[in-house]
């Protein structure tokens, strides 16, 4: 652990709802002040830090006097709008005590799915870092209802790490780290001090849901580490109330669980494609095409496509799945879904006669394809 964190120059820190709001009792000023002191100290060491903070909905619930998390989307959105005010004010106040400027950045996964908006978000965050300002990032829950239902800030933390090419992602949680089983239920649970991010066994170990305040459990943290590893960022999962946890990690101390990035770093455009959470459509391919993509690094040709699902246009990111539903890859479509249906199962030599024109002989070119 010492080398991974000690050498990290750009770090994304993610903190969850239960920590930020002290289990839903409202924004925990002391805890946020403590993290901000550590962030300021890291910045003083010449490191660049970004904070991904949950807690807007939980803080809004407290301000509105709600004891239970509502199920209606419009009520969740209202709580997020109310709570985001207090959250931003608290971070600004605590960071300013140390002479550090802060910036509020609200993102949705849709912002990162559009290539131009993705690059704009990246440019903004890198500019803030160059100005010695600490971005405080959250999902824009007020306007995107499907993220309130299914999203989580662990995923957002990984997406931000990939967006800015961070060296490390630190996920602060209410648990000491990852165990082989839920330690609250299994006294034989074994603590995992270090593992390789993306190891399938980790996902089996981390199964289970989180608290009623937040949206993720340990499984979302393991999956976030896997996602962050694709850009070369290693992940630490640690207890957020451990004294000086960020400073001690940066000094190389072994705290929590380290999930090391061992996969090859993706090129920038392929990283953007890999980070898509919601694809416009899907093409289902036969076993021969699966082998060509996986084993030979070939482009996807229309003749290997057996089914086209969804509606998409040329240039959209689409999923490529096997006939048993496993995602094989994703990439930029050379043809719209209506065109793809006409040329599926046909040799590339027939594209022009079928469509009246031919963009490319491939459904997805290998340079625009990233394997799952």
From Swiss-Prot:
Residues 280-358 form the PUA domain. It catalyses: L-glutamate + ATP = L-glutamyl 5-phosphate + ADP. The keyword Electron transport does not apply. It is found in: Cytoplasm. The keyword Cytoplasm applies. GO terms for biological process: L-proline biosynthetic process. It comes from the Bacteria. PANTHER family: GLUTAMATE 5-KINASE, ISOPENTENYL PHOSPHATE KINASE. Catalyzes the transfer of a phosphate group to glutamate to form L-glutamate 5-phosphate. This is Glutamate 5-kinase. It comes from Methylibium petroleiphilum (strain ATCC BAA-1232 / LMG 22953 / PM1).
């Amino acid at each position: 652990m010492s080398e991974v964190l000690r050498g990290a120059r750009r770090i994304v820190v993610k903190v969850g709802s239960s920590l930020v709001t002290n289990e839903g009792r409202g924004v925990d000023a002391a805890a946020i002040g403590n993290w901000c002191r550590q962030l300021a100290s890291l910045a003083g060491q010449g490191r660049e830090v970004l904070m991904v903070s949950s807690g807007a909905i939980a803080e809004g619930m407290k301000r509105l006097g709600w004891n239970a998390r509502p199920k209606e989307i419009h009520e969740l959105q209202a709580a997020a709008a109310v709570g985001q005010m207090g959250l931003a004010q608290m971070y600004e106040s605590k960071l300013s005590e140390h002479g550090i400027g802060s910036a509020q950045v609200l993102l949705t996964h849709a912002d990162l799915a559009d290539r131009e908006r993705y690059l704009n978000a990246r440019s903004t965050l890198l500019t803030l870092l160059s100005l010695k300002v600490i971005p405080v990032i959250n999902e824009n829950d007020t306007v995107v209802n499907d993220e309130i239902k299914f999203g989580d800030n662990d995923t957002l933390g990984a997406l931000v790490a990939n967006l800015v090419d961070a060296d490390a992602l630190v996920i602060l949680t209410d648990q000491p780290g990852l165990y082989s089983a839920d330690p609250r239920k299994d006294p034989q649970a074994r603590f995992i001090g270090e593992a390789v991010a993306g190891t399938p066994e980790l996902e089996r170990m981390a199964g289970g849901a989180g608290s009623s305040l937040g949206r993720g459990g340990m499984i979302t943290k393991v999956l976030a580490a896997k996602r962050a590893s694709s850009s070369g960022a290693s992940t630490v999962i640690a207890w957020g109330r451990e004294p000086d946890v960020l400073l001690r990690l940066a000094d190389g101390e072994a705290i929590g669980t380290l999930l090391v990035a061992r996969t090859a770093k993706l090129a920038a455009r392929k990283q953007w494609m890999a980070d898509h959470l919601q694809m416009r459509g899907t093409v289902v391919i036969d076993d021969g095409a699966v082998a060509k993509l996986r084993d030979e690094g070939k482009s996807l040709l229309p003749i290997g496509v057996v089914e086209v699902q969804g509606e998409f246009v040329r240039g959209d990111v689409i999923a490529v799945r096997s006939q048993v539903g496993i995602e094989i890859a994703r990439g930029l479509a050379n043809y719209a879904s209506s065109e793809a249906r006409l040329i599926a199962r046909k040799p590339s030599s027939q594209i022009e006669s079928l469509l009246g024109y031919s963009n490319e002989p491939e459904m997805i070119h290998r340079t625009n394809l990233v394997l799952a």
